[in-house]
């Protein structure tokens, strides 16, 4: 872009008298035409603004002539007023038109410099994938669905009854201390396990019942191996002939199918208020150490009774496991918090 210094030099205009009454129409027309030509030479918006001030500002010849109108006779005022109005209008119109033209030129230059070269190769599309916790959940569900179980879900905001009372955990029971619970009030809370789904299912359905209950649960705990929100998958089977031997076989087969290898599985006696007998399940790792992976047991007769099921006729077993725990073992991850930090560098490894 060229920026000639002479474009704002008013010496290019004809020299006229500073006294208005010494001018005639021809001189003013010549002045106006010269000003319009000067305006057309300006190729820079900033210089055009400078020229606007010089041609129409307080110190311009045009303003100086206009100030003398009060000294003229009425007839001269009419004559010179018409001439000066024509001069000012033409100069203002020329300035406005040139500014619009320069703005268009500047915009086109900017658009040209920012244009997209469509001949360049495009960036490849990025594919998303499931979260590792979701993939592990689906892997677990796939096994149990093939084994004849249905998937059941329930509310995450639960009543104290479904989360504790119906599961044989009364308000005075010491097992309550095992649950650092998020309470809304004395009656409602964030569920600490997915066991309430089992209660709701048994209340609404007659045996035989075969369900798994995956979902989010909440406990007031947070460290390298615990999170205030995590995922559980629990299972329940109630029939007229459910046995602990059947439970052991189901869990052992599930663990070997999940980890896709033969495992040494150990069942240790334990205690849960809602099952009797109860057991913790361990597997032997490659270093010869036992790893606790889940809990299980035969459904306590009182729990069946609470749900309106005849405990003399039916028996059942239940089991539960932490999905993040299985994900950590499956992928070799030692920090549970990585699953919840949304770090793409971590998550993209599972695509």
UniProtKB/Swiss-Prot annotation:
Which Pfam families does this chain map to? Phe_tRNA-synt_N, tRNA-synt_2d
Q: How is the cofactor bound?
A: Binds 2 magnesium ions per tetramer.
- Top class in the EC scheme: ligase
Major place of residence: cytoplasm
Give the matching SUPFAM superfamilies. Answer: Class II aaRS and biotin synthetases (SSF55681), tRNA-binding arm (SSF46589)
**UniProt keyword Ligase present:** yes
**Gene Ontology terms: biological process:** phenylalanyl-tRNA aminoacylation
Name what cofactor the protein needs: Mg(2+)
GO cellular component, alphabetical, reads:
cytoplasm
Q: PANTHER family, alphabetically?
A: PHENYLALANINE--TRNA LIGASE, MITOCHONDRIAL, PHENYLALANYL-TRNA SYNTHETASE
Under what name is this protein listed?
Phenylalanine--tRNA ligase alpha subunit
């Amino acid at each position: 872009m060229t920026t000639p210094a002479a474009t704002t030099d008013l010496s290019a205009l004809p020299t006229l008298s500073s006294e208005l009454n010494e001018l005639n129409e021809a001189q003013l027309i010549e002045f106006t035409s010269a000003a319009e030509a000067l305006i057309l030479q300006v190729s820079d918006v900033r210089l055009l603004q400078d020229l606007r001030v010089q041609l129409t500002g307080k110190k311009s010849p045009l303003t100086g002539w206009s100030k003398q109108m009060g000294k003229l006779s009425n007839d001269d005022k009419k004559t010179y007023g018409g001439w000066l109005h024509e001069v000012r209008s033409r100069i203002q119109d020329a300035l406005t038109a040139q500014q619009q033209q320069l703005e268009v030129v500047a915009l086109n230059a900017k658009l040209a410099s920012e244009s997209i070269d469509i001949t360049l190769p495009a960036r490849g599309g990025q594919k998303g994938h499931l979260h590792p916790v979701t993939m592990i959940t689906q892997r677990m569900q796939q096994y149990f669905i093939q084994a004849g179980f249905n998937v059941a879900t329930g509310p995450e905001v639960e009543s104290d009854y479904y989360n504790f009372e119906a599961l044989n955990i009364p308000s005075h029971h010491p097992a309550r201390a095992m649950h650092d619970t998020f309470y809304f009030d004395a009656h409602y809370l964030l569920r600490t396990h997915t066991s309430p789904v089992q209660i709701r299912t048994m209340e609404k359905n007659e045996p035989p019942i075969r369900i798994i209950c995956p979902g989010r649960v909440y406990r007031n705990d947070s460290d390298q191996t615990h999170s205030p929100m995590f995922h559980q998958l629990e299972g329940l089977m109630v029939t007229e002939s459910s046995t602990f031997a059947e439970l052991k076989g189901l869990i052992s087969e599930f663990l070997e199918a999940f980890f896709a290898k033969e495992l040494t599985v150990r069942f240790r006696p334990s205690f849960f208020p809602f099952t009797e007998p109860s057991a913790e399940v361990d597997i032997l790792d490659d270093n010869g150490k036992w790893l606790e992976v889940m809990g299980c047991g035969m459904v306590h007769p009182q729990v069946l009774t609470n749900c309106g099921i005849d405990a003399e006729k039916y028996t059942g077993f239940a089991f539960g496991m932490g999905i993040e725990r299985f994900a950590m073992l499956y992928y070799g991850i030692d920090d549970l918090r990585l699953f919840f930090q949304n770090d793409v560098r971590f998550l993209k490894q599972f695509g």
